[in-house]
């Protein structure tokens, strides 16, 4: 067994993947009142906490720019590289665009890990970048105490095909394209308590590109976001508020990965489960009656706060196009995709209502 095979990357960090994000509520509070330079070409910036920025190229297209990086969420360096790439690219798909170039962001603990690990990390990333048709154009590395890998991604979208998280309309149906549960499953992995089938299922989900945009060009997608570190509740809240809607979500329609139920029931949680709940609690309403109590196991409530890494897209679109869109998405291999709710007129500060369709 060589030195690489003996290293479990998850044991080198305290938290991994998008669960390592700073708490959304605290971050929003700290950044409140900032007034960055805002030229007219910047169409989407920081105001709605969207997945990427849109810059008007004045040729009928927007430039999409985003970046994402994080610490290891799995033990294998190839898998970690692939997940980091898929996660970064996802933001471009969430804006309705196609990715074009990538720049690497790598912090590497050269004093504690062999530099030879960098090659499988990048090989994994390249396997996904190449599949997405993304050119790796450069990058930057530093020596750091903790391994971190990510990418800055640039892409393009036609102006009339761009998606944002601010366009959902009352009456829209909401489609989620991937199952939930990567946060709790990888928390169990870190403790050595996750079954191999759970781990492999989560990895397969995380390295799956959200490249459905080109296949939905004939569907009138009103709004979109990708579900990552703030969980379904956090990102759906941002989308609902940005769209001035209230989202009615059916807890029993939510798709989840194999092992998510068992891991949540056994208490394999991250700090993000708590911070995501804190961020959304005052904007969320749970409709529970004594008669329904048996249908609301505690793990199903926790799964909406589960921090996803390279999670699915949440799409808002006209109800009449919902089934057609769902069939297209499922035909592309997203077998867990589901219609999980509806958008309705805004109810003051309530962004989400669970099990109230």
What do the predicted segments below correspond to?
Residues 53-64, 207-213, 279-294:
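Acidic-glycine-rich active-site phosphate/pyrophosphate-binding loop
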Residues 77-103, 120-131, 208-220, 225, ...:
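Small-aliphatic-rich amphipathic alpha-helix that forms the alpha element of a beta-alpha
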Residues 2-15, 26-29, 110-135, 142-147, ...:
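Glycine-/charge-enriched secondary-structure boundary and capping motifs
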Residues 16, 111-116, 162, 193-204, ...:
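Flexible, glycine/proline-enriched loop segments at strand-loop-helix junctions
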Residues 57-74, 79-82, 98-194, 341-344:
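Glycine-rich anion-binding loops of enzyme active sites
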Residues 42-44, 52-55, 91-94, 126, ...:
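A generic local secondary-structure boundary/capping motif
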